[in-house]
Curated annotation (Swiss-Prot):
Keyword check for Metal-binding: no
Subcellular localization, as worded in the UniProt entry: Cytoplasm, Cytoskeleton, Actin patch; Cytoplasm, Cytoskeleton
Gene it is expressed from: cap2
Entry superkingdom: Eukaryota
Database matches in InterPro entries: CapZ_alpha/beta (IPR037282), CapZ_alpha/beta_2 (IPR042276), CAPZB (IPR001698), CAPZB_N (IPR043175), F-actin_capping_bsu_CS (IPR019771)
Protein name per its UniProtKB record: F-actin-capping protein subunit beta
Family: Belongs to the F-actin-capping protein beta subunit family.
Length: 266
């Protein structure tokens, strides 16, 4: 019964507007509380921002830095609200986490020119895993708004002087615009892609460089897919449904075309 409820919940969420994922998750879990943990760990939702009380720096919240009702800051390695026995990475993995946060902070400034980013690592039996989070919002105006959320989850398995990386990347995008001539447009959705690769590792620092290249390449591919395939298709559909010309002008144009066709058949 639980499996059927879980599958039905996922199927329902896939059919609803992605911008309302958080609200819809809360509604489903209030009806079936037993699904809460499974849904929170399985469903990607827009990232939330919180400020670290110790360092005064913003960080992003997700299921990977959550322990109960508390969230761990990547800058201070402390939980908010405070948690005495919260799960934190080992000393080695924490050093890698700090280095990765510094590296992706530069990446965020270069590629996003702002926004918020956070990196979280945790230990595995034969290596370690982590998540890279990036969020950029368009400053809401009277007529437009938008948000981009990137969630990159990876596993790194040690193999002698090589490491096997498995990366799962998700982009959650929301764009909205409203004009008097065209009305309201709301474009929301998400995309997930995966890649696995073996890369050489000389030291722990190599992991940060390897993961950085994987994320950079994946984001470039996903941006191109969004722009060329999804946005291109949406543009074609909107072009078929809407016209910049008024209805009267369109009617006159169709009437002229009919007259020309009829004259050609005389």
């Amino acid at each position: 019964m639980a499996d059927a409820q879980f599958d039905s919940a996922l199927d329902l969420l896939r059919r609803l507007n992605p911008r309302d994922t958080k609200k819809n998750l809360q509604a489903i879990t209030s009806i079936v509380p037993d699904l809460t943990e499974d849904l929170l760990s399985s469903v990607d939702q827009p990232l939330e921002i919180r400020r670290c009380s110790k360092t005064k720096r913003d960080y992003l919240l997700c299921d990977y830095n959550r322990d109960g009702d508390s969230y761990r800051s990547p800058w201070s390695n402390e939980f908010d609200p405070p948690l005495d026995d919260g799960t934190v990475p080992s000393e080695r993995v924490r050093k890698l986490e700090v280095a990765a946060n510094e590296a992706f902070d530069v990446y965020r400034e270069l590629y996003y020119e702002g926004g918020v980013g956070s990196v979280y690592f945790w230990d595995l039996d034969d290596g370690f895993a982590g998540v890279i989070l990036l969020k950029k919002g368009v400053t809401p105006g009277a007529k437009s708004s938008g948000e981009w959320d990137s969630i990159h989850v990876f596993e790194a398995t040690d193999r002698a002087r090589m490491s096997h990386y498995k990366l799962t990347s998700t982009v959650i995008l929301h764009l909205a615009n409203e004009t008097e001539s065209l009305g309201e447009m709301d474009l929301s959705g998400n995309m997930t892609r995966q890649v696995e690769v073996d890369l050489p590792v000389e030291s722990d620092a190599s992991h940060v460089a390897n993961v950085g290249r994987l994320v950079e390449d994946m984001e470039l591919k996903m941006r191109n897919l969004l722009q060329e395939v999804y946005f291109g298709k949406a543009k074609d559909v909107v072009g078929e449904l809407r016209s910049l010309a008024s209805l009267s002008e369109a009617s006159k144009e169709r009437a002229t075309q009919r007259e020309m066709i009829m004259s050609m058949h005389r």
